[in-house]
């Protein structure tokens, strides 16, 4: 029997979460998941990770998960701040094997962020809860095997500040592909330029689902290492066979503003959607596409 494949949006707000949660699009920082039991691949570990790990305790479709691979894009804390709230650190004897993957810079930021006295070291939290907790260093241009999935990495264009005072981060984009199944691409946080287009096209080639940094409405607004809904629309036109999700919504934008931008740039594009939290997609193998799940 073919094992179902699910893609879920758990956190789609960029940079910081909205408090109190007023948005119907996104309130939690970045977190997405790709499930094909017994393997669960997690893209970033923002505050959406708490929602994902709670679902793992309550939804039957996660019952067969034995190994979890968390793919961190970069060192900014909004992409790993959810680790301390992961349900697997607070329930005994879960039997899970969890591996945190990322660049040296990101893994070191996580280690320092959860070191004493700032918090409890993650390895200490894992004692008696997880079967195993490991870290694995990745670099741009790698290809690794995680369960049945092939993971390719690339360098993304992300930085803090502006002009000559920009501080660049070691940021990784990911392409997850399954032999005979889907290819899913995650490019966030990322500011597209003419120099990055070749990489973007290579990572999205023949794919079925693409998640992009769409922090701003327009390409002219690109700054601080972030993209736009307008650029997401460009990718959707170039990849008509893929569902393109515009995520990392800027925290200053209301739902109305985000939807207006989507209607303006997505006119005529049936394959461009907003990344909306708690929305789930299931892989339709005969059609070779993802469709919204009715769960």
Where are the model-predicted features located?
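Cap/insert and terminal regions of metallo-dependent hydrolase folds
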Residues: 190-279
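Binuclear metal-dependent hydrolase catalytic cores
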Residues: 1-185, 242, 255-294
